[in-house]
């Protein structure tokens, strides 16, 4: 199910990093994702195929997610984890992310491993667990730094003398990737890009509450929608009817679970590990809600997928004490899931709207072609186009002034926006689209041709 094209800007940056890692040139963007890129680059060197390299990491990540989810089940002394395993394995978003040229799924596997050792620390207070916890946190910083706020509640460990082993493990594993990254980037360059990109993420382009126009209400709606619609194929407008069946099952499981928790059992003797689990997810929820791009990037909700899968597992268990009945319920729930996931994975193998534009321009036979677009799309086309007859220009006032020159030289002009200066020219519009539930970013694009 691996893909063979760059579906968006972020995928391109990670794909290019496998060939030539350079944070200064956004291959990939800061903070560099050094450990992920190191692994990706080495697998790519063996396979010479970025799709296979990415899906290999994705496959290992799925294995680790399921393995340590089972370990967590046993650690919490819960039974019948088989339902959750199947729900996770057939999850459409996990399948898509396992093939996307990004570190998110690998980061999720590390988050679950790290959380497992945090719970072990709470239950057993062993030095080994403190050390491993610190090491994995350091590795996580080199794979998916934005998942680290999940562990802010673990700061309570500072009152335990053994936390020094976690600090030691963190310093060793972080130093193993950060020192080489600073060395190859240059100390001054690293500080400069750290300052610029950190400020840019929070205040300019990062899609945070400080840089976007979306209200807190809209951000909350998007977050919940992404968790259920993208994460678990809940019904939404223009989706296949099978998502309605899927949604009914999810609602039934949730209602049954909440009845069991709040009406049949009194919330007594809540253990510390349960409180910490709640606080970890609350911490990450607040972080994503305020400081991540949830306008069109559902991938930031990935840590909630194992939690919802666990809740669905418990919902199935709460409906019946008879295992045969549970198995029937699970099969009926998974049948539409298999259909939905299969369709989304097949659609993912087809080009995104942005990649379709690239293919369209590659097939342009005219010897004189110029493309006007915004900076991000120009970056994408500049790194992917094979057609050497095409000039790429950013849409700005200075380049607008060159329009007359290209017209006089008989250039064919393409633009991602309508050009008022060419209103007298013959205009053709081309439409490119993909399923937004495969990738929310730029699912519909237009290209305007002037001759």
Residue map of PLM features:
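Short helix- or helix-capping micro-motifs
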Residues: 84-92, 116, 137-141
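Hydrophobic, aromatic-rich transmembrane alpha-helices
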Residues: 225-274, 278
């Amino acid at each position: 199910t691996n893909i063979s094209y760059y579906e968006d800007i972020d995928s391109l940056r990670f794909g290019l990093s496998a060939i030539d890692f350079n944070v200064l040139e956004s291959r990939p963007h800061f903070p560099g994702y050094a450990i992920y890129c190191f692994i990706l680059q080495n697998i790519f060197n063996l396979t010479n195929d970025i799709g296979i390299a990415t899906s290999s990491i994705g496959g290992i990540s799925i294995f680790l997610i399921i393995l340590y989810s089972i370990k967590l089940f046993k650690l919490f002394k819960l039974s019948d984890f088989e339902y959750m395993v199947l729900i996770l394995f057939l999850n459409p978003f996990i399948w898509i992310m396992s093939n996307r040229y990004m570190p998110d799924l690998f980061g999720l596997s590390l988050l679950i491993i790290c959380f497992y050792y945090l719970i072990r620390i709470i239950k057993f207070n062993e030095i080994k667990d403190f050390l491993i916890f610190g090491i994995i946190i350091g590795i996580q910083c080199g794979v998916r730094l934005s998942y680290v706020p999940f562990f802010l509640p673990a700061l309570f460990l500072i009152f335990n003398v053994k936390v020094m082993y976690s600090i030691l493990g963190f310093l060793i594993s972080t130093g193993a990737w950060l020192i080489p990254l600073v060395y190859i980037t240059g100390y001054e360059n690293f500080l400069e890009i750290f300052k610029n990109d950190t400020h840019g993420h929070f205040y300019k382009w990062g899609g945070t509450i400080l840089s976007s126009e979306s209200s807190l209400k809209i951000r909350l709606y998007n977050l919940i929608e992404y968790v259920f619609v993208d994460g678990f194929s809940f019904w939404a407008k223009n989706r296949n009817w099978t998502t309605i069946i899927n949604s009914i099952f999810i609602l039934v499981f949730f209602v049954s679970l909440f009845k069991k928790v709040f009406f049949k059992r009194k919330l007594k003797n809540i253990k510390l590990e349960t409180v910490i689990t709640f606080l970890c997810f609350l911490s990450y929820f607040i972080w994503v809600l305020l400081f991540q791009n949830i306008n069109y990037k559902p991938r930031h909700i990935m840590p909630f997928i194992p939690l919802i899968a666990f809740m669905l597992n418990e919902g199935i268990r709460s409906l019946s004490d008879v295992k045969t009945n549970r198995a029937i319920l699970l099969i009926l729930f998974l049948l539409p899931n298999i259909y939905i996931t299969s369709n989304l994975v097949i659609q993912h193998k087809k080009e995104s709207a942005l990649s379709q534009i690239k293919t369209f321009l590659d097939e342009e036979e005219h010897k004189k072609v110029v493309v006007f677009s915004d900076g991000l799309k120009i970056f994408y086309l500049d790194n992917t186009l094979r057609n050497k007859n095409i000039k790429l220009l950013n849409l700005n006032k200075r380049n607008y002034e060159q329009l007359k020159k290209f017209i006089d030289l008989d250039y064919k002009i393409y633009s991602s926006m309508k050009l008022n200066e060419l209103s007298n020219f013959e205009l053709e519009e081309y439409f490119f689209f993909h399923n937004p539930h495969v990738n929310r970013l730029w699912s519909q694009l237009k290209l305007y041709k002037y001759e």
